[in-house]
UniProtKB/Swiss-Prot annotation:
It is found in: Mitochondrion inner membrane. It comes from Lemur catta. GO terms for biological process: electron transport coupled proton transport; mitochondrial electron transport, NADH to ubiquinone; mitochondrial respiratory chain complex I assembly. The chain crosses the membrane at residues 3-23, 38-58, 87-107, 117-137, 140-160, 171-191, 211-233, 241-261, 273-293, 301-320, 325-347, 366-386, 413-433, 457-477, 482-502, 583-603. It is an enzyme of class 7 (translocase). GO terms for cellular component: mitochondrial inner membrane. This is NADH-ubiquinone oxidoreductase chain 5. GO terms for molecular function: NADH dehydrogenase (ubiquinone) activity. Core subunit of respiratory chain NADH dehydrogenase (Complex I) which is composed of 45 different subunits. Pfam families: NADH5_C (PF06455), Proton_antipo_M (PF00361), Proton_antipo_N (PF00662).
Amino acid sequence: MNLLSSFTLVTLIILTLPIIMNVTNMYKNYPYAPYVKSSIACAFITSLIPTMLFISSGQETIISNWHWMTIQTLKLSISFKLDYFSMLFMPVALFVTWSIMEFSMWYMHSDPNMNQFFKYLLMFLITMLILVTANNLFQLFIGWEGVGIMSFLLIGWWYGRTDANTAALQAILYNRIGDIGFILAMAWFLMYSNTWEFQQMFMLNYHPDMIPLIGLLLAATGKSAQFGLHPWLPSAMEGPTPVSALLHSSTMVVAGIFLLIRFYPLMENNKTIQTLMLCLGAITTLFTAICALTQNDIKKIVAFSTSSQLGLMMVTMGINQPHLAFLHICNHAFFKAMLFMCSGSIIHNLNDEQDIRKMGGLFKSMPFTSSSLMIGSLALTGMPFLTGFYSKDLIIESVNTSNTNAWALTITLIATSMTAIYSIRIIFYALLGQPRFTTSTPINENNPLLINSIKRLALGSILAGFFLTNNILPMNVPQMTMPLYLKLTALMVTITGFALAMELNLMTNNLKFKLPSDIYKFSNSLGFYPMTMHRLIPSHNLIMSQNTASLLLDLIWMEKTMPKNLSQLQMTSSTAISNQMGLVKFYFLSFLMSLLFTLLLII
């Protein structure tokens, strides 16, 4: 084992120590939350060593020392793949999680089960790192299911709330649909390749069938909340804010895109699957951007922005740029985690108020949080020389210079301008103007746990893009020639979004619409998707099953088989046996006629 693999394993071992400590009685003598935070900070510093070694050497390493089991001809080993993607993602994930852990110590300080909460967050991070460093499908599946079950436990952390339980179930059920695709791909590779090791699969199946690729795309659609399987992502906001920050920045939601990046050697020559990814990503990024425009819950707006950015990453995969999609994952983690933490700070200080219409004037009362929120929002829009710019600008350039579906590319540009609209809307309503809230407690953002954690991510949102693009391969990009208007497209689209946002905000102050428009209803109701999928179809199924149970069962069993059948049998048998017909009127009439006839004869 070389230095790179040794330090990587040390990083993973440092992260597992708090879990082992929790099993023993040692943690009862020491505060557990600071210990977990310090462990992640140490793991981050340790992970920088193998990352810098990899950047300097550029040599991929595979650790495969532990044989696990042999099933007939399938040999399974615990193996770690230390390549470009895993080596660069580990420090980013650890840095972001370190800040989120420190923020959680402030945000969850009054929770009676805070130690368990920190253990869950740490296990969430470990399962994501297992997924990222896995060198075979089975190990990747363990990490994949691990982030799924940990998200279920963390989203439903406040289990006394019905909405939190429903959101947790929704997340796990939508991800089960995606897991069907993952298991389908695993079964196909086992049947046709007899291996789950990445290197062997890529050599044997350079041009595979569509079945495993469709399965992998379905898995990524479920985990990364693409259109069709997207409703769980905004619902996940029912969990605590640190969970939202970790879930949306560097763990679960990017796992689907990471899966496609890992399998890009099988997809790079398949135009059908690339077109599917491009169109799916374009629809997702536009639809979720439209939904974000009219939301009033600050966490829901940030959640829809995550879904929109995931759609943009899927578009990047669709134009065959996996390294660019990975760069956007790394850049996106910094400012998205910070946006959620700033939102959590505002919500905590305003006594759990999440409606941006009831905020305002926070720039004066919470200057540090407001400044950080503004930096994060501008980085999200792709403002030049902030972190988001370095990946988003390259994505828009690649989109403009690619020869693929023009409609999908146009939709992507429209969605990019909408990113600026909802980002400015948060700034306009929450930070500017006059206060529209009444607080029973004074607003305070002087806690060092809050300040230090947001400060680190604010620096990352400003500088991380520059450092990443200047230190990772390729460091020297070949000189490209393109017209000036294509180079400036990303900036022009963002400026257009800013102008539209200010115009809309000013218009809503001056005009009052009598009735909401259909477009507003579509956006505010999330495209009527939840009420169609979660209410209409289940209610129809319920009514149909109710009718089947009550009408059909009653008709056959309660009526036809027993009571009515017996009465019908008795009536038929009595009619056949009896001499009398039961015609009482006829009998009386015949008696009367005979009586009258007798009287006439006597007279």
